[in-house]
Amino acid sequence: MNTDYTPLVNVPIKREDIETCRFSNWYPLFKKHCPTAEIIGPLPAEFIEYLEQDGIKIPNENRSFYSEDLTINDDNEYSDWDNEDDDEEEDKVIQQEVKKEIDPLADFPELHRQIKDVITKYGAVAPKMNWSAPKDATWILPNNTMKCNEINEVYLLLNASNYIAHDLQHAFDECEDIEDQKKSSDFELVLRKWFDINPALEFRIFIKDNEILGISQRDLNYYDYLEPLVDKFRDLIEDFIDDEILDRFPLKSFVIDLYIPRPFNKVFLIDINPFARMTDPLMFSWSELLTKNEPVTPIGQEEDYEFRLIKENNVGRFACKEHSENQVPTDIVEASLNPEAIRELTQKWKELLSKQSMEEDSSSDSNEE
């Protein structure tokens, strides 16, 4: 049996291309088309270590939802009860671990103050780093969004996000200029003024050599009112890219995220991403985008690219929340904020395993009889 296989198409990318897509490099060019934001950087090394460490130490801020029930004992540990009766050996281990943790108030107080000032200025913010936003970590906040009303929510989101970890550790892994991969990079924290986005009205546009390869709905759920608006969206997107982006952005190949809110008379620039496999192709595949049989038509002329929308209600899709693969039980989240809770969770886990083992042994004995 003969089977045709589509060869994996290489997507060459250089470090310079990825750096060009850094928020601080394109935001000044298109500021009037973007949500209001402030950039803090370069970030101190202690802050990067803080985000990379296992677990996170939450500052005991006044009026903070995340520390109001915690008290500081003589060992400077956060706990909701005294540990006088705890095992001394375990206490010594925990104390050593706590001392190793980075404390924002002690290790980067100036950055801590800057973040608080921006939150006070805007009321609420949505954080991101050089390239990525912690969309995969919204499960850790009570509102299940990236809306941060206080500084501890910023810390929790960034620390829990795999996307942020990728920015810090693997941003240049796909670069073909291998030597440049080893160069260090300055990191920055972006705090966007919070505004509500209707996820149905955000679109991802793939551009290669200044030509549109395809447009994809950003949120992969079905919205029945989108399809009748496709022609309007297409015109707005093409005009915006042709008039505002192509002549000002230095790269010819990139991926851009745009938001078109009602009444559909303005386009917001949300993000610019590298034209590389690290960027999610959403309703396309990278091989599909790169192996089109016919050349695409320049922007402004009759289009021959696809504008892809979810065409029908997918019950299975709605049952699976976006980024659910990154979510964990709330017990684990709470335990990560408190060494005492970690001990309690571990003990419960051991008890469950012991109970399961006893039940299996009992079942085995019954079968033998």
From Swiss-Prot:
ATP-dependent protein-folding chaperone for the eIF2 complex. Binds to the gamma subunit of the eIF2 complex which allows the subunit to assemble with the alpha and beta subunits. Keywords: ATP-binding, Chaperone, Cytoplasm, Magnesium, Metal-binding, Nucleotide-binding. GO terms for biological process: eukaryotic translation initiation factor 2 complex assembly. ATP binds at K128, W131, A133, K135, R192, K193, W194, F195, E202, R204, R218, D257, D271, N273. Belongs to the CDC123 family. It is found in: Cytoplasm. GO terms for cellular component: cytoplasm. This is Translation initiation factor eIF2 assembly protein. Pfam families: D123. One of its GO terms (molecular function) is ATP binding. InterPro entries: CDC123 (IPR009772). The keyword Chaperone applies. Mg(2+) binds at D271, N273. The lineage of its organism: Eukaryota, Fungi, Dikarya, Ascomycota, Saccharomycotina. It comes from Vanderwaltozyma polyspora (strain ATCC 22028 / DSM 70294 / BCRC 21397 / CBS 2163 / NBRC 10782 / NRRL Y-8283 / UCD 57-17). The keyword Isomerase does not apply.
